[in-house]
């Protein structure tokens, strides 16, 4: 079940389920639970960490410190959509990474103003 949001988004971007399955079979796309990243060194890859607003500072550090040479990492998330009771808008891993790396040229931060799901989803994230 935890794979479904990622698979849904990749299927949308690729246009069909067959393309996603083909890339996964060829090892071009890997989807992995955070539990299995410990101890790894990920080199020459493009890593996307989705829903990073729900991660703790420790989890973000665990992920970023696995990044090897030639790898780019993207953290995505919306601090208005936190559903982890152990973090909030200021204590979550995404906010921590943004704040910690803002003075370094090796990192960048982009804030999108418009939600992608729907007007209702955007409103709900603000008012609920």
Segments from the language model and where they lie:
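Conserved helicase motor core of SF1/SF2 NTP-dependent helicases
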Residues: 1-46, 54-128
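Walker B catalytic carboxylates
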Residues: 50
